[in-house]
Amino acid sequence: MSLARSTALLDEKNTLTSSVTDKYRLAGKITQTCLQHIIQTVLTQYETYTVGEMCRMGDEFLERATTAVYKSVAEKGIAQPVRIEKQEFVGGVSPENGDKFQGGMLAPGDLVKISLGVYIDGYTAQVTQTEVVRHVPNTSAGETEQPLTGSPADAVCASYLASEAVIAYLAQVTDPNPGKAVGVVTGTKIRELVEKIAAAYHVKIVPGSSVRRIRRFLAGQHDIVLERDYKGVLWEVEGEEERALHAVKLAESEAKQESTEGAVCLYEQHIEEEENFTVEAGEAYQVDIQMAAAPQKGAIRLYDFQGYDESGTVINQYGRDFSVTYGLKIQASRKLLSQLEATTSVYPFKLSHVESNVAKARLGLGEILAHQILVPIPVKVAKFVPLAALYEFSKNSKARARDEASKAVPVARNSSSVLLTNDACLRLTGGQAFPPPYVHSAFELPEDVTNLLKLVGHKHGAKVKDVLPGDVDMAPAKEAKMEE
């Protein structure tokens, strides 16, 4: 097939027709419904269930719900297995039954990120919502609910408001008076907006945060799936460290009254080129913002979690790299690969979604991983690295000293899928059904960001319409039904 023909087919499949929009909408509805029930479980039964048990409850619901709809569509299912990540955990926490690490028990004061996603015929809706686990006050004894405060609260506010502000900004392309309020909507301005809010709340943007266009089967699956004509803003570990160090070196030169002419941050040049794109009506976007409670100067790095006793953890999420082929030699590996080809797509998955006997499936995993047919998705934690440690590392490359200086920090995250139709922004996930938790920050939004948020819902401006959760029981004993 020619490049021109394949591009035309890609564009055709991603046109927001009524049929495509309906599939996106249903994926959003299932995702929203599952999220609603998991939040309720997290906040009211955190002493009863482990993180792993709650993740598996959510996965069971998603499997039933997607099986029950669009019976003629083969490509449907879980786009993101349910993850429940507390405090500094930022990825990969979705334990299998029997794993030593079950994500722990939640406790009052924990920041909890709940992530999940669904796809219908390749059209994807994903969500992350941050909640705060609370001690239920004894009202008869005069106790009242108190907000979370301090830097964790700042991170919650910044994450929530940045995601809302970006969605409000994206929605302007659907305004009947385009360009009147904010001008052309670009990737460069998206970055500026998020970074302005992070600075206002004295927090750090966590690497991996992104605002990117999504298309059929292309929803940011850990960069496993190569994408032509990519549009997106991405915060990367090395890049953010380079920017922080560049600022230090500029300050040193200025203090010494040395010329800074020609002092260029290569990463700044890179993002200026990569993010010089225009957002247009007819596109879909995933807005995924993470903020860390780290008010000091420095940067956030992501580390593989090795268990509380440093004995390591079992990876339980994987992605398929379809660009890799290899003639497997071991029978157990060939059998597992055959099962993968029959049951998985381009999205992350758990072995229990492929083979009920996870221990048996893991017997064939080694050879598949060795030849990179599958890409493991490890459990990750976020740590703050002080600027002084980064600076020393830049001079002597001693990673151990840098890592020993790092400190785990709580992270808040908000992620939503949106469709930019010709007359409104259709918010598939998140939105008014999921308000932020009860927190209090001493900081405030800049006035221009507040004004941007006010544009949404204005009678003469852009409209944001939410897909709401359905009324579905998650209990396995009952038949889950959802309208197509």
UniProtKB/Swiss-Prot annotation:
Its EC number is 3.-.-.-. One of its GO terms (cellular component) is nucleoplasm. It comes from the Eukaryota. It is an enzyme of class 3 (hydrolase). Transmembrane segments: none annotated. GO terms for biological process: proteolysis; ribosomal large subunit export from nucleus. Gene3D superfamilies: Creatinase/methionine aminopeptidase superfamily, Winged helix-like DNA-binding domain superfamily/Winged helix DNA-binding domain. It is found in: Cytoplasm; Nucleus. InterPro entries: Creatinase/aminopeptidase-like, PA2G4/ARX1, WH-like_DNA-bd_sf. SUPFAM superfamilies: Creatinase/aminopeptidase. Keywords: Cytoplasm, Hydrolase, Metal-binding, Metalloprotease, Nucleus, Protease. GO terms for molecular function: metal ion binding; metallopeptidase activity. Probable metalloprotease involved in proper assembly of pre-ribosomal particles during the biogenesis of the 60S ribosomal subunit. Accompanies the pre-60S particles to the cytoplasm. Component of the nucleoplasmic and cytoplasmic pre-60S ribosomal particles. Belongs to the peptidase M24 family. This is Probable metalloprotease ARX1. The lineage of its organism: Eukaryota, Fungi, Dikarya, Ascomycota, Saccharomycotina. The gene is ARX1.
